[in-house]
Design a protein with these regions (language model features):
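Active-site beta-loop-alpha junctions enriched in small/polar residues
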Residues: 13-19, 51-53, 79-81, 105-108, ...
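Alpha-helix-loop-beta-strand connector modules within alpha/beta enzyme cores
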Residues: 1-18, 57-78, 115-138, 172-184
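Catalytic cores of alpha/beta
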Residues: 20-37, 81-97, 118-127, 131, ...
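Short secondary-structure boundary/capping elements
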Residues: 27-30, 57, 84-85, 113, ...
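Glycine-enriched alpha-helix->loop->beta-strand junction motifs that scaffold or abut catalytic
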Residues: 6-9, 42-45, 68-72, 94-101, ...
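Glycine-rich phosphate-binding active-site loops on the catalytic face of alpha/beta enzymes
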Residues: 37, 41-54, 97-112, 149-172
Length: 184
């Protein structure tokens, strides 16, 4: 329904469980099945991430998911923030041109620590992969996040909703307010 109703690209989250980003072979099959469903509905792409027990990217699973996602845009989601080494993760992801976006808050820490990391990631990613800054981005900090990180893309969650409610309706007025703060 969404794909037919809007003219913006839609990427669908592929995440079989919320408890972790480490997945079993059964989870992999569920994810591949879901990716096929995304293709059938005509969405622009998928959003997923997969880690191993040592909090590194699970390369074997990633390659299987990328194979299943052929023809779709791929975003590596905030599992990225769980990595023990974000820069190493970025380098690995850049080896896979099928991944064109990383959704990240810059890992753990306060706003200044995360902003510094995000700035480094944006600079190192260059044009190879888009860094989509998300997680804690609000209408109150988005202008400073843009300035501190040199980021160009931001993922807004509850700040775009009525009463700042995660499950509330999207507020066009709030989106205009946020866009104004970004100068767009």
């Amino acid at each position: 329904q969404c794909v037919e109703a809007v003219s913006v690209p839609i990427r669908v989250m592929i995440r079989p469980k919320s408890s972790s980003f480490c997945y079993s072979s059964y989870d992999l099959e569920v994810m591949k099945y879901d990716i096929e469903a995304v293709k059938e509905i005509g969405a622009d792409g998928v959003v997923f991430g997969c880690l191993n027990q040592s909090q590194s990217i699970d390369v074997k699973m990633l390659e299987k998911l990328l194979h299943a996602s052929k023809g779709l845009n791929v975003t590596f989601h905030r599992a990225f923030d769980e990595l023990t080494n974000l820069e190493e993760g970025l380098r690995l992801i850049m080896d896979y041109p099928a991944i064109n976006t990383i959704l990240t808050s810059g890992g753990y820490g306060d706003l200044n620590e995360r902003s510094t990391r995000l700035q480094q990631l944006v600079r190192k990613a260059d044009s190879s992969v888009e860094i989509l800054i998300g997680g804690g981005v609000t209408d109150g900090n988005i202008a400073s996040m843009k300035s501190l990180t040199n980021g160009k893309s931001f993922h807004i969650g509850r700040s775009a909703r009525e009463n700042n409610d995660l499950y509330g309706k999207i507020s066009i007025e709030q989106i205009r307010h946020i866009k104004n703060k970004l100068g767009v």
